[in-house]
């Protein structure tokens, strides 16, 4: 699960009975860096909080994490990734990093952010941007263990929106993305 670092401000642990109704309780949790081997996880310095209430999180740096929580007799592990638009490389090892901040251009004129990349070396990425039947832009770029971030602002020539196409091949495998922004 990829999460934009600036948007993850709170978490909430739902503690429910069999009928799905919230019940009082406390939860112990800790957030630790993800490990490649399950045996390497060490859980200590737990934080205790009330269940069913928003819990403010301290700012965290980009990276891969595990949330380990205990509530009653239940134990939950959730892995997640935090990243920012300022990251220059994927924060995890991945052949395919693609992120689009929204599928709609904001009415206030602010941009939609696009990130494309991989932790692999030597990629040749090709792309095209269409509005209806009109080609707006085509191009390519080379990158190695990096992310390319673009700010896309709405332009009148886009009409009802644009379609983005990005693709690259690595070790005989095609990675491609087609997304629309209205």
Segments predicted by a language model, with ranges:
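A structural signal for beta-strand and strand-to-loop patches characteristic of beta-rich domains
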Residues: 1-182
């Amino acid at each position: 699960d990829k999460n934009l670092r600036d948007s993850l401000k709170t978490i909430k642990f739902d503690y429910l009975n069999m009928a799905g109704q919230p019940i009082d309780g406390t939860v112990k949790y800790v957030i630790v860096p993800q490990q490649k081997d399950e045996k390497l996880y060490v859980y200590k310095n737990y934080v205790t909080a009330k269940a069913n209430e928003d819990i403010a999180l301290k700012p965290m740096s980009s990276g891969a994490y595990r949330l380990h929580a205990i509530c009653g007799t239940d134990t939950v592990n959730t892995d997640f990734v935090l990243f920012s638009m300022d990251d220059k490389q994927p924060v995890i090892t991945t052949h395919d990093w693609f992120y689009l901040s929204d599928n709609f251009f904001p009415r206030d004129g602010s941009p939609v952010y696009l990130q494309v990349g991989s932790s692999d070396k030597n990629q040749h990425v090709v792309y095209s941007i269409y509005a209806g039947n009109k080609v707006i832009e085509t191009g390519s770029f080379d990158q190695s263990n990096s992310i390319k971030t673009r700010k896309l602002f709405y332009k009148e020539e886009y009409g009802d929106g644009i379609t983005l196409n990005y693709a690259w091949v690595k070790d005989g495998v095609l990675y491609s993305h087609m997304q629309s922004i209205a």
